C-alpha cells in the first residue's frame, strides 16, 4: 500500500512514521503533489500554528492537491484543525475549508489550564469502522489549545471544560484532535482501522 505522510514542516513526522511501521506498513514522507495524488492513504500531521501550516502548504502547492483527493486522508491535531474553514489563531487564518461552516476557536474554560495536555476520553459510536475494536473506556493523548466545536461532521467528542470535536469525518477526509501515534494500543488500533478503511 502506498502511504504518504505530508511534510508541512510543522510536525514531528518520525513518531507517526514509526507508529505506521509498527503496524507493518511502509510510508513515505513527502511534499510532492504527484506522490500525494497517487498514494492510497495520506496522513496530515500538524504541530504549531495554523498560519505556519497554511504558509507551508501554500509554498509547496499542496492546498489544491488536498482539495482534489478522493482517497482517505487523516488530519492529526493541527492537521484536523486546518480542514476547517477558518481559524481564530494568529489573528485569523483562512484554512483549507473541507469541513464547511466549521471554525477553529480557542478552547475557553475558565478554571482549566491551557494547553489541554494529557489523557482524555472520547465519546463515540462504535459502529463506525474507525472505532473498530476500541473500548469506550480507552483514553487518548491530547496537546492543544484550539478546538473545532461540535458540528454535523463530528464522529466523537471530548470534554475539557466544554465539549469539542475530537474525531471528524466528511467523505474521505478524517480528522483527530488527539495524537493516535502517542496514544498507546488504542491509538495504534485507530491508525490500523484508518489504514484498513
Swiss-Prot record:
The active site is at 77 (nucleophile), 179, 181. It catalyses: 5-[(5-phospho-1-deoxy-D-ribulos-1-ylimino)methylamino]-1-(5-phospho-beta-D-ribosyl)imidazole-4-carboxamide + L-glutamine = D-erythro-1-(imidazol-4-yl)glycerol 3-phosphate + 5-amino-1-(5-phospho-beta-D-ribosyl)imidazole-4-carboxamide + L-glutamate + H(+); L-glutamine + H2O = L-glutamate + NH4(+). CDD domains: GATase1_IGP_Synthase. The keyword Hydrolase applies. IGPS catalyzes the conversion of PRFAR and glutamine to IGP, AICAR and glutamate. The HisH subunit catalyzes the hydrolysis of glutamine to glutamate and ammonia as part of the synthesis of IGP and AICAR. The resulting ammonia molecule is channeled to the active site of HisF. One of its GO terms (molecular function) is imidazoleglycerol-phosphate synthase activity. The lineage of its organism: Bacteria, Pseudomonadati, Pseudomonadota, Gammaproteobacteria, Enterobacterales. It comes from Buchnera aphidicola subsp. Schizaphis graminum (strain Sg). InterPro entries: Class_I_gatase-like (IPR029062), GATASE (IPR017926), Imidazole-glycPsynth_HisH (IPR010139). This is Imidazole glycerol phosphate synthase subunit HisH. Its EC number is 4.3.2.10, 3.5.1.2.
Amino acid at each position: 500500500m502506498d502511504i504518504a505522510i505530508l511534510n508541512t514542516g510543522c510536525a514531528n513526522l518520525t513518531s507517526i512514521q514509526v507508529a505506521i511501521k509498527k503496524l507493518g506498513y511502509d510510508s513515505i514522507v513527502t511534499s510532492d503533489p504527484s506522490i500525494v495524488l497517487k498514494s492510497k492513504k495520506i496522513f496530515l500531521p500538524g504541530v504549531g500554528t495554523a498560519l505556519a501550516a497554511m504558509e507551508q502548504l501554500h509554498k509547496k502547492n499542496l492546498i489544491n492537491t488536498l482539495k482534489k483527493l478522493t482517497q482517505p486522508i487523516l488530519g492529526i491535531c493541527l492537521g484536523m484543525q486546518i480542514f476547517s474553514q477558518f481559524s481564530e489563531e494568529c489573528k485569523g487564518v483562512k484554512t483549507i475549508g473541507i469541513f464547511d461552516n466549521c471554525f477553529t476557536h480557542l478552547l475557553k474554560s475558565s478554571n482549566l489550564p491551557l494547553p489541554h495536555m494529557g489523557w482524555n476520553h472520547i465519546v463515540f459510536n462504535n459502529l463506525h469502522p474507525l472505532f473498530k475494536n476500541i473500548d469506550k473506556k480507552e483514553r487518548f493523548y491530547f496537546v492543544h489549545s484550539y478546538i473545532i466545536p461540535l458540528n454535523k461532521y463530528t464522529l466523537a467528542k471530548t470534554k475539557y471544560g466544554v465539549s469539542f470535536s475530537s474525531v471528524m469525518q466528511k467523505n474521505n477526509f478524517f480528522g483527530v484532535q488527539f495524537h493516535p501515534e502517542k496514544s498507546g494500543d488504542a491509538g495504534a488500533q485507530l491508525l490500523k482501522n484508518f489504514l484498513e478503511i
